[in-house]
Amino acid sequence: MMSQPAKVLLLYAHPESQDSVANRVLLKPATQLSNVTVHDLYAHYPDFFIDIPREQALLREHEVIVFQHPLYTYSCPALLKEWLDRVLSRGFASGPGGNQLAGKYWRSVITTGEPESAYRYDALNRYPMSDVLRPFELAAGMCRMHWLSPIIIYWARRQSAQELASHARAYGDWLANPLSPGGR
């Protein structure tokens, strides 16, 4: 008997989604999967007033949490930062009694405006992507979540339609069964 795929909450945070070809292409397969809930934070909270109980309920209902966003100033867009600070609160996700996310999985899916070669100690950004994403990895650890290797689409706006379609297929395949032995 085949087991059901893990329930995935895909938190999408892009303040200019209509202008992001790469992120729209990446989202397309996710919208067609029954085990994936796509939650567009900027569509739900244009005023930045986050419904914390609703967001925490969504987190409880899913086993895999995906944070898909562009890299903005070596971090995430402002609304996602606000979401992280407010929703992953002490007593819910961390600290005494904060075990609601323990054992769940965190995966960051990032698009960048620069090539991979720009993310080295001796290059433009002076740090590798693993260092840039360390705060997210630490947040996952704070929540006692499993950190899955990030998916990074470098120089997203310069990817060809074929390259983006290939990334989207691979992403969709992973989302369809994210906890399979080859998916982690």
UniProtKB/Swiss-Prot annotation:
Catalytic reaction equation(s): a quinone + NADH + H(+) = a quinol + NAD(+); a quinone + NADPH + H(+) = a quinol + NADP(+)
Organism: Escherichia coli (strain K12)
Enzyme Commission numbers on file: 1.6.5.2
Gene it is expressed from: kefG
Record-stated family: Belongs to the NAD(P)H dehydrogenase (quinone) family. KefG subfamily.
Highest taxon above the source species: Bacteria
Keyword Methyltransferase in annotation: no
Top-level enzyme category: oxidoreductase
Family annotation (InterPro entries): Flavodoxin_fold (IPR003680), Flavoprotein-like_sf (IPR029039), K_H_efflux_KefG (IPR023947), KefG/KefF (IPR046980)
UniProt protein name: Glutathione-regulated potassium-efflux system ancillary protein KefG
Reported function: Regulatory subunit of a potassium efflux system that confers protection against electrophiles. Required for full activity of KefB.
